[in-house]
Design a protein with these regions (language model features):
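N-terminal amphipathic/basic-hydrophobic helices that include classical n-h-c signal peptides
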Residues: 1-5
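Catalytic strand-loop segment that frames the active site of acyl-thioester-processing enzymes
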Residues: 6-50
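HotDog/MaoC-like acyl-thioester-processing domains
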Residues: 15, 22-26, 88, 97-133
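Hydrophobic residues in beta-strands and at strand termini
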Residues: 31-33, 82, 128
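Residue-level signal for inorganic ion chemistry
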Residues: 52, 96
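Hydrophobic beta-strand-centered segment that forms part of the acyl-chain substrate-binding groove
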Residues: 60-95, 105
Length: 133
């Protein structure tokens, strides 16, 4: 099996973390997408939207590592759903839930925080092999 290494350079400048709350296994991260995020370059002129890969890698995976500590490279991603467009300037809520067993599973849900109420933008599951002690 070929492993894919996720590189998240320039990610720290891509999203503004406003707050983090929750317990050891469940976290809520509030963040904002800057108007000038590099992720919108070429995606798409006249109607910028955050690419799905940025939602999974730059938001869900990176924030899982920040709040839960170092994780191994992801072994698989499943149940990925992209339900709404994330736009420049959007306020977001990221819910992360970690389950540990034979492998570590992180479930994520990204919601756009709109005046009329939250709307799910994306969700899914990322699996990681457990690090050997």
């Amino acid at each position: 099996m070929r492993r894919v290494r996720i590189v998240s350079r320039h990610v720290s400048e891509a999203f503004e973390i406003e707050s983090t709350s929750g317990s050891d296994e469940q976290r809520i991260v509030r963040l904002r997408v800057p108007l000038s995020s590099r992720f919108f370059e070429g995606h798409f002129d006249g109607m910028p939207m955050l690419p799905g890969v940025a939602q999974v890698v730059a938001i869900a995976h990176r924030e899982a590592e920040r709040v839960f500590g170092p994780l191994s490279a992801p072994t698989r991603m499943s149940r990925l759903k992209f339900q709404d467009v994330i736009k420049p300037g959007d306020a977001l809520s990221l819910s992360l839930t970690r389950e540990r067993g034979a492998e570590t599973i992180v479930r994520f849900r990204i919601e756009r925080l709109l005046a009329e109420g939250p709307r799910v933008a994306s969700s899914g599951t990322i699996a990681y092999t457990n690090r050997e002690s």
